[in-house]
Each structure stands twice: as structure tokens, then as C-alpha cells.
Amino acid sequence: LHKEYRRQRQMCIRDRLYTKNSRMKDPEYINIGDIQLIEQRQNFHVRIDPPGGDLGDYIPFYFGGHSPMLLNIKTGYRGIRKRPQDELIYIVCRIKDIVAQCPAWCFTDGHAKNKLTEFYNDIKDLTHVDWEVVCTQFWGNDEANMDRMRRKQAEFLVKDCVPVSCVAGIIVKTADREAYVKTILSRLSIEIPIYVDSKNNYFYP
């Protein structure tokens, strides 16, 4: 899963998802979340080769919803600019489609910048992802699991770009936002299923 700010939707859906560093990126690209962390990631080395490079060379996907960063965006915690969740969408891709269409990718078992995190480049190693944690809404560390928050933020990283043919669906928070996205897709003559997260399976209540 990958979050996009709404002003970025039309360009990324029409063409491809590009990294922040790409010369093909949307000129109106807007960073959301922790700007300092985003900048730190640009030159943070990916600890597996292939595919190698830095995190700034990759498009990051979460495996599930309710990320810690989304909560920070919702609440404005840690000085992060507060935004309504309705301004965000999830762009959903299937791993099998990315593997088939994107030549360079890897994934982690936790937050990519954490020293404890391992990187993998073999689909067989998806067993190292803590699927119970990445799919839960409640991810805080406690005495029972002091590593839950790191594991919650496991990432699938795709190098350079992701073609729109990999987009299996779009998740929005409200019916109003569904109508807005439908208008964009219709204008671009693109058919992508849209799902309203009425039960808060991905967005926070």
C-alpha cells in the first residue's frame, strides 16, 4: 500500500509512480509526514544488493494500513503538519504484479532506517514479515512486544518507478473522495477499482 497526497493523484495515476528524486516526478509533488525523516531517507543506503542504492531511489509501500506516520499526520504529533485523512488515498498494488513488472525491488521486516531491520530480495523471505503486526491498528510497544512499532513499518521498496498497470485499486476514506477520484479516472480513461474504507480497516477512526 502506498499513500499519496491528493494533488499528486492525477499525474501518478495517468503515468507511473516515480521516486522523489526522479526527473519525471510531478512538479507539484507535495511531501507529507515527517519532512526531516524524508530527507534523511534520501541518502540512506539500502542494505542489500541487488538492488542496492539509497532509499531515495525507491518508492516505499506499506504492507498494511494504520501506519504510525498516518497517525502523526492525523494528529499533528511531533510537529508534523496536520492534515485530514480525507485528503489522502491508498494506492494498492499486488506484490505479484510488482515482481512481474518491476525489475528492481526489495523489502524489509521493519522500518527501513532502523538498525535492527533486515532487507530481503527473495519473495520466499516474506515469512520474515510479521503479518499480524503489519495488519493491526494497535501497534504500540509494550512489555509483551517491544519491537511491535518497528515491525509495523515493514516496507516493500520498488526502485525508480511503478507502472500504473500495477495499481490494483484505490482506497479512500469517504464517499465524497470516492466521487472525486472517479472523476479523475474518468477524465484519464483509466479503470481502477475504488474502495471506501467505511469500517476504518486502513484509515484511523
Residue ranges and their predicted role:
Residues E4, K20, G33, I38, ...:
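Surface-exposed loop/turn and secondary-structure junction residues enriched for glycine/proline
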Residues R6-R7, F61-F63, I91:
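Short hydrophobic-aromatic micro-motifs
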Residues M11, I38-I48, A144-M149, V158:
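Residue-level signal for well-ordered alpha-helical segments
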